[in-house]
């Protein structure tokens, strides 16, 4: 009997697929483990260089002045990200909030934001003012900031000629590394570099801004090391390692990070304020563990992609592809299959496993969404989770996985509930 069936009731045909997938995935698992080892040693070196001590994890209250623990964590982030400086704060509520702070920090009335990799994902549309519902709520457009975009080509690659044409009129060039709700691969670092080089050749003063959500530690470099001026991400995704309870980060050029700090706090205050309360230990520990946790999440993705491919689905990316974020997307085919897949992920989660996800409205999204997230941290996507909008072709987005053993069990149960019903 498979060890899996000691704990969950899987059908023989599902276990047969599992056995084949595990064999096919081994070379790709080993590749990710090599990336993990490189990034973990880079992380260790950054901690040592900063001379972080146990007292740096104690936290501060009130204004948070002279918080050496906060300063050292930001120094570690900057070194690991290949950046001059970083802003790492628990006051960032989500990836969208962190992106909004950064964009408002960089842009002024009359400036133009160029989305060089097509329309950003749904929640950022509201920040910009593209969804038509937020007029008067303080969007970028409300403040006289213009928006332009270079749509992706039919094959989901950047349109470099269009970027060259549009970059001279823009102050910020926005690159979204992950796919959002598109069935494309995440952009690799070579593509990010080419977009950055193309925009900068047309406008040497343009600021290259990368939404790095879901992409940290999937490769041995980060976007600042290939031409980005600023990168932004969330601590309840990759860099929090499943341990950081909240927060986000902005890293890059020192002058730009300072502008973002003025927006988060107040002009004249910048990075000097922001108490850390009881969060430093979890933020330090989560970041330290992040390379290993991201490896487990990518191994989960590789395994899920292989299983889905054996079922005749067409996941993006494929298990044998290079991985540049932790997300897998595939067309579930029907609403029932999408809901069943999410319910299977939820049933094999450590938290709220008894819940059965159902479609419901979600702030920032135009369609009802079904979402599974049995996570220790609410909304965490480095923990195994999946979601999808209730619209044809019922595309499902799977991400995360703190450890492969448990995530494998969840993927199997999801596939069984979606495609092997009695």
Language-model features: locations:
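N-terminal small-domain helix-loop-helix segment of the aminotransferase-like
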Residues: 63-69
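Conserved C-terminal alpha-helix-loop-beta "cap" of PLP-dependent enzymes
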Residues: 309-422
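Conserved PLP-enzyme active-site core in the AAT-like
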Residues: 3-26, 33, 43-56, 65, ...
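Extended, compositionally biased flexible segments
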Residues: 71, 77-82, 90-91
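Short glycine-rich or small-residue beta-strand-to-loop segments that form or flank ligand, phosphate
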Residues: 60-61, 87-90, 326-331
């Amino acid at each position: 009997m498979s060890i899996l069936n000691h704990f969950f009731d899987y059908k023989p045909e599902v276990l047969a697929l599992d056995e084949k997938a595990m064999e096919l995935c081994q070379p790709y698992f080993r590749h990710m483990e090599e990336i993990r080892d490189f990034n973990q040693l880079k992380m260790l070196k950054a901690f040592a260089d900063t001379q972080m001590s146990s007292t740096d994890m104690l936290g501060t209250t009130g204004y948070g002045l002279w918080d050496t623990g906060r300063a050292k964590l930001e120094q570690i982030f900057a070194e690991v990200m290949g950046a001059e400086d970083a802003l790492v704060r628990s006051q960032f509520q989500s990836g969208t909030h962190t992106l909004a702070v950064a964009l408002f920090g960089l842009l002024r009335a009359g400036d133009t934001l160029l989305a060089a990799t097509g329309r950003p994902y749904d929640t950022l549309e509201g920040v910009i003012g593209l969804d038509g519902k937020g007029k008067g709520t303080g969007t970028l457009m409300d403040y006289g900031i213009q928006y332009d975009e270079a749509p992706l080509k039919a094959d989901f690659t950047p349109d470099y000629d269009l970027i060259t044409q549009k970059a001279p009129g823009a102050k910020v060039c926005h690159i979204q590394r992950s796919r959002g709700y598109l069935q494309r691969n995440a952009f690799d670092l070579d593509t990010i570099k080419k977009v950055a080089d193309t925009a900068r050749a047309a406008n040497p003063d343009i600021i290259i801004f990368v939404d790095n959500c879901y992409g940290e530690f999937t490769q041995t470099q980060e976007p600042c090391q290939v031409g980005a001026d600023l990168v932004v991400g969330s601590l309840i995704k990759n860099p929090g390692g499943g341990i950081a309870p909240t927060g986000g980060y902005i890293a890059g050029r020192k002058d730009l990070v300072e502008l973002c700090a003025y927006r988060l706090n107040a002009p004249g205050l910048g990075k000097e304020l922001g108490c850390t309360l009881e969060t430093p230990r979890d933020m330090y520990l989560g970041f330290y563990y992040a390379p290993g946790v991201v490896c487990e999440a990518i191994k989960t993705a590789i395994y899920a992609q292989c299983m889905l491919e054996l079922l005749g689905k067409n996941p993006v990316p494929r298990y044998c592809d290079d991985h540049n974020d932790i997300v897998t997307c595939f067309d579930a085919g029907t609403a029932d299959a999408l809901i069943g897949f999410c319910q299977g992920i939820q049933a094999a989660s450590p938290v709220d496993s008894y819940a059965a996800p159902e479609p419901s409205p979600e702030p920032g999204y135009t369609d009802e969404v079904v979402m599974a997230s049995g996570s220790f941290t609410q909304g965490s996507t480095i923990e195994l989770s999946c979601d999808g909008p209730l619209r044809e072709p019922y595309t499902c987005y799977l991400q995360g996985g703190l450890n492969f053993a448990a995530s494998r069990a969840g993927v199997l149960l999801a596939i069984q509930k979606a495609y092997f019903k009695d």
